[in-house]
A protein has these predicted regions:
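Juxtamembrane helix-loop-helix junctions in multi-pass membrane proteins
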Residues: 7-37, 78, 84-86, 157-181
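Specific transmembrane alpha-helical segments of multi-pass solute transporters/efflux pumps
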Residues: 8, 12-13, 41-92, 127-129, ...
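Hydrophobic/aromatic residues within transmembrane alpha-helices
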Residues: 19, 28, 32, 79, ...
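Juxtamembrane helix-entry segments on the extracytoplasmic side of multipass membrane proteins
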Residues: 21-30, 53-59, 117, 132-154, ...
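Helix-helix packing/entry segments at the starts of transmembrane helices
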Residues: 29-31, 69, 88-94, 160-183, ...
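C-terminal transmembrane-helix exit sites in multi-pass transporters
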Residues: 39-51, 96-118, 245-265
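Hydrophobic transmembrane alpha-helices of multi-pass small-molecule transport proteins
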Residues: 40, 62, 102, 115-134, ...
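Transmembrane alpha-helical segments that form core, pore/gating elements
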Residues: 40, 99-101, 105, 137-195, ...
């Protein structure tokens, strides 16, 4: 299930690269969240989950829609007009680093330990390695990769803010936030992209948008929450290691993308930082307990 989720989320960068041929960023993101919204609400109704009427819930999911959908989706999609999908996926893997820093500042119960601090520093060291070289075959500056890091920061804010929905059915929270982000994106897409002037998208673009929305968003959320319930949040950190690998395989295999050696080194350093944060590979195995024979 972890590998499946990593392929779905890694595939979002791949689908973006294809769809950007015909669609501008805001319209593409609007298609993603609006189609995903319809799928998620269908699941909510299928499971007969009660829809809250409390205004605080809807205000909360509106904030989540901005932090977890609107801001990061738009930033990442725009960045992919400048950098490869593989590099965007690598930089997006810094999300847990930002989540830890934000939780340390914003909460009293999730302070950084020495091990996690070292892991965060190592992870950002990997970012420095990546930023130390051009981000593609031509000079595109730092704006596009910085946009991905800002998206990761926004995801981190959403991760901390979203803990207030611990008692809410996760699929309901997901449907609420994609609904809110759809409503926020609609006027932006109309005013900026003027989609009625866009050419008719090709079949490959339509399929990419459907894959982006239904697989990499709606199905990915459903699978994410299933793993969270079955395996716990700590095991989901493994997905962060696997997403860039999936994106690199898809980008290199189907889009002809090539990463510089420094990008691969940077990814490895970020991965090392995440492993240090996770801590399980560094912990000493517990000695086997003697088995007391039963009568």
């Amino acid at each position: 299930m972890l590998i499946s989720l990593s392929v779905l989320w890694g595939g979002s960068f791949f689908f973006t690269e294809i769809a950007l041929v015909d669609l501008p960023p805001l319209t593409l993101v609007l298609c993603r969240v609006s189609i995903a919204t319809m799928v998620l609400w269908w699941v909510v109704l299928l499971r007969d989950i009660a829809i809250p009427r409390d205004p605080k819930f809807w205000a909360g999911v509106a904030v989540m829609g901005g932090l977890n959908n609107l801001i990061p989706f738009c930033l990442i999609v725009w960045s992919q007009t400048q950098i490869t999908s593989s590099l965007a996926a690598i930089l997006n893997a810094t999300t847990p680093l930002f989540t830890l820093l934000i939780a340390h500042i914003a909460t009293d119960s999730e302070k950084l330990t020495l091990r996690k601090t070292i892991g965060v520093l190592i992870g950002f060291g990997g970012v420095i390695v990546i930023f130390g070289v051009p981000t593609s075959g031509t000079e595109v500056g730092l704006l596009a990769p910085a946009a991905v890091l800002l998206a990761a920061f926004s995801y981190g804010c959403a991760g901390v803010f979203g803990r207030r929905f611990a008692t809410t059915p996760p699929i309901l929270t997901a449907a609420g936030m994609t609904s809110a982000s759809s409503l926020m994106l609609l006027p932006l897409s109309i005013l900026i992209d003027q989609p009625w002037h866009l050419p008719v998208p090709t079949t490959s673009t339509i399929l990419a948008v459907l894959g982006f929305a239904m697989l990499s968003t709606a199905l990915a959320y459903i699978l994410y929450f299933a793993i969270l319930k079955r395996a716990g949040a700590s095991n989901l950190l493994l997905v962060t290691f696997l997403i860039p690998i999936s994106a690199i395989l898809l980008g290199g295999g189907f889009l002809g993308e090539v990463l510089l050696g420094q990008h691969m080194i940077g990814m490895a350093v970020i991965g090392l930082g995440l492993l240090v944060i996770d801590g399980r590979l560094l912990s000493r195995p517990k000695p086997a307990q003697p088995v007391t024979p039963t009568k």
